[in-house]
Amino acid sequence: MYTDLKDKVVVITGGSTGLGRAMAVRFGQEEAKVVINYYNNEEEALDAKKEVEEAGGQAIIVQGDVTKEEDVVNLVQTAIKEFGTLDVMINNAGVENPVPSHELSLDNWNKVIDTNLTGAFLGSREAIKYFVENDIKGNVINMSSVHEMIPWPLFVHYAASKGGMKLMTETLALEYAPKGIRVNNIGPGAMNTPINAEKFADPEQRADVESMIPMGYIGKPEEVAAVAAFLASSQASYVTGITLFADGGMTKYPSFQAGRG
């Protein structure tokens, strides 16, 4: 536990499910004030809010589409209005879907890029704007992926969004380091989340993925949440501009680096 996270205001996009929800609960355990952004499932968001509160934190939910500039502006401003400030912005919302690249429509490409990359930029921009204007040494955490460095056949749009996120994060970190604002990525590997539930329910597919992970198992959302808590804490005060991979060593596995998966 990180005592300095108590009462910190943390915004999490896509915070009602999967990795986002696990992070929300972890910050609840840290007694933080959590702003849970969700896209369209209010019931799921309310469940996440309850879980955060039961863990020891405070929480509100805010509906919004991260591809819409006005929604992201509203999200950040709502956090500030409700809790008085902003300390940590976690850009977690993301989508993926497999399509052969020669069949990928522009609409599909744009949906993934707009959600994963543009949405993260908008969240970063609005948070940093507030930090700069109020002389706050704030923290931005972007949810990247092992695929910011590993090519992924059938997911060219997703890989492009995460590759772009890598350099976006590094650039923002360099630009705002003199102001004490830290910007980092988390790069999860294979995770037991709802987006992967169908795939990992198939024993053969699950075993195939596990065979590419040196640690031998698919990660738990709580393991990514622990990384987020560390990066948000003062224990990481000298850490900026990096991607911290939580992947069980997947990025070091030769056959996966060759494009398998």
Curated annotation (Swiss-Prot):
UniProt xrefs under Gene3D superfamilies: NAD(P)-binding Rossmann-like Domain (3.40.50.720)
Matches recorded under CDD domains: GlcDH_SDR_c
EC numbers, comma separated: 1.1.1.47
One GO MF term: glucose 1-dehydrogenase (NAD+) activity
Keyword Transmembrane helix: no
Enzymatic reactions: D-glucose + NAD(+) = D-glucono-1,5-lactone + NADH + H(+); D-glucose + NADP(+) = D-glucono-1,5-lactone + NADPH + H(+)
Record-linked InterPro entries: NAD(P)-bd_dom_sf, Sc_DH/Rdtase_CS, SDR_fam
PROSITE patterns noted in UniProt: ADH_SHORT (PS00061)
Active-site annotation: 158 (proton acceptor)
Residue numbers binding substrate: 145
Similarity-based family: Belongs to the short-chain dehydrogenases/reductases (SDR) family.
Self-association and partners: Homotetramer.
Name of the protein in question: Glucose 1-dehydrogenase A
